[in-house]
């Protein structure tokens, strides 16, 4: 929890309480449904929560923003971002029902009113969103093909509507067909060596009628 306060010192008392609860909630759920690897669960705050919040260092969501989290797994990056941005609406989806069961359990325990969680494929999602977030669920060309028709036309942020994607390693080959993509190195924001090769990729996408 200390690493969260280090990089996000202006949290409200409620946000601090919610972030603190995540430790118990995920350890408890993980004993029943394995959504976080055994070797990573004890590094929950660094490898999952702080990593998710890397998006918040790139983009401050304005009130009323809508965000789709594709392949949310146990709720990352959606749940940490929903705690940080209570006036932003988050829609978390995953194709695996037991993962959504965990997500819903955590959301209910935290009383997050700005989160909807559902078992669904990205291609079947109705509606459009300001931003679509994810954490390395697939390669970028496939990801874009899933969600390219789900971006809102009107922009209200400095960064244009589109994808905010958490991924590590050398992305040059994967992004060669996306010259509009901008990479933000999390190693320049967070000190832990875990973030040495981790990045946030912003890929603006035009509205597709």
UniProtKB/Swiss-Prot annotation:
The keyword S-adenosyl-L-methionine applies. The keyword Disulfide bond does not apply. Coiled coil: none annotated. It comes from the Bacteria. Gene3D superfamilies: Vaccinia Virus protein VP39 (3.40.50.150). Keywords: Cytoplasm, Methyltransferase, rRNA processing, S-adenosyl-L-methionine, Transferase. It holds the Pfam family GidB. S-adenosyl-L-methionine binds at residues 71, 76, 122-123, 135. Its EC number is 2.1.1.-. NCBIfam families: rsmG_gidB. Specifically methylates the N7 position of a guanine in 16S rRNA. Belongs to the methyltransferase superfamily. RNA methyltransferase RsmG family. HAMAP family: 16SrRNA_methyltr_G. This is Ribosomal RNA small subunit methyltransferase G.
């Amino acid at each position: 929890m200390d690493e969260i306060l280090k990089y996000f010192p202006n949290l409200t008392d409620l946000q601090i309480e919610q972030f603190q609860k995540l430790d118990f909630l995920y350890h408890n759920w993980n004993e029943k449904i394995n959504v976080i690897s055994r070797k990573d669960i004890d590094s929950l705050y660094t490898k999952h929560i702080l990593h998710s919040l890397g998006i918040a260092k790139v983009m401050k969501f304005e009130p009323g923003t809508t965000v789709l989290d594709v392949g949310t797994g146990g709720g990352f990056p959606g749940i940490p971002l929903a705690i940080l941005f209570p006036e932003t609406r988050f829609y978390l989806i995953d194709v695996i029902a037991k993962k959504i069961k965990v997500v819903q359990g955590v959301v209910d325990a935290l009383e997050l009113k700005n989160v909807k969680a559902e078992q669904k494929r990205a291609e079947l999602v109705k509606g459009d969103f300001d931003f679509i977030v994810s954490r390395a669920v697939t390669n970028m060309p496939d990801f874009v093909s899933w969600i390219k028709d789900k971006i809102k036309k009107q922009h209200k942020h400095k960064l244009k509507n589109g994808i905010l994607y958490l991924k590590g390693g050398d992305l040059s080959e994967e992004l060669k067909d996306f010259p509009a993509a901008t990479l933000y190195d999390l190693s320049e924001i967070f000190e832990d060596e875990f973030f040495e090769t981790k990045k946030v990729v912003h890929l603006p996408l035009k509205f597709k009628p």
